[in-house]
Amino acid sequence: MSAEIICVGTELLLGDILNSNSQFLGTELAKLGIPHYYQTVVGDNLERLKQVIKIAISRASILIFTGGLGPTPDDLTTQAIAEFFQTPLEENPEILADITEKFAQIGRKMATNNRKQALIPVGADVLPNPSGTAPGIIWQPQEGVTILTFPGVPSEMKQMWQQTAIPFLKSQGWGKELIYSRMMRFRGIGESALAEKVAHLLELANPTVAPYAGLGEARLRITAKAKSLTDAMALIEPVSQEILTLTGDDYYGADQDTLPSVVGQQLRQVAQTVSVAESCTGGGLGEMLTQIPGSSEYFLGGIIAYDNRVKNALLGVNQQDLDQFGAVSEPVAKQMALGVKEKIGSDWGISITGIAGPGGGTDTKPVGLVYIGIADPNGQVEGFEYRLGTRRDRLAIRYLSACNALDQLRRKLLIKI
């Protein structure tokens, strides 16, 4: 027995709004231990809606609809469900009274077309909407098929799910097991290389291990099905520990961890501070660091040294090196890092200089060439070269450059913790 999520609305197909409902419902189904293998998005078309229902009941026993419950002619979800199961609609007086009262509370008269929202299939139960005028239904139109409908407004859908849908599903025997996942995050290793390292773990059945790729990082999702969170964690933990052994310092965090949050935790642990000198990222590294609440404990500030004159005047970069090696070079990156550390008085100094594109590249210094400098508390400076590729756009190169700088600092801080 599994569920299928069906999101209704032409605006979803056109990309006018983000389909956050499917993400929420997918997470909630996992918490209840209800497997779901398909999510469908369909426009506001009666025949296509009925076609989707036909396909869905062939592969799922719980159909969860969002959207298409409004008062306008293109709100067709309830009508499509009723027609498919050849069941008439009837006006529910309690729903109609509730809608009328909600309009009265805001000093408005209910429009005639709102009566449409009081129509539900004969035999269906009402799924109340405390916040809006579009109630849903809970209906078992035939053996082995359960239908739940929700409005497309995320806040209304979530409230209805928590208050009514979860108790109903638990009453049907769901919720005795749960599906829990841990997302492990890695930098400095690609998805394919990571998959090779943990190849034997990808064959596990419970928990399962699956690789994913992100911009500049790779991930492994470990998913367990168990009767309790404690049991699920007991399945996940030994696999997680084995992955840590196999991947070493490439692992940087799990679940909601980010590079800025992890680096911030490290700096707090060692009671040290950092400052940044940026060229091609234009403040992006400082912005990342200050995303974290309380970052003023360890981030002192930065200098955006875009022009060579600023690199020389504020960071003390040697003019001869600028002339000989160019602004995008390891010697300049190292001097920028040491310069900002000394200028601001932080324990650590980080610098970034590179060619973000789309122009400015040459055969010897192509777009995507980036140098990072790290100055440590002892005044020792190390430089790192990255070639991020000529096909990436400017935003991606800038973002990856800032991430790589943070990752190099993270790795150095690991030695101190």
From Swiss-Prot:
Task: Quote the InterPro entries the UniProt record gives.
Answer: CinA, CinA-like_C, CinA_C, CinA_KH, Competence-induced_CinA, MoaB/Mog-like_dom_sf, MoaB/Mog_dom
Q: Which domain of life is it from?
A: Bacteria
Q: Name one Pfam family in it.
A: MoCF_biosynth
Q: Which family does it belong to?
A: Belongs to the CinA family.
Q: What is this protein called?
A: CinA-like protein
Naturally occurring in which organism (per UniProt): Gloeothece citriformis (strain PCC 7424) (Cyanothece sp. (strain PCC 7424))
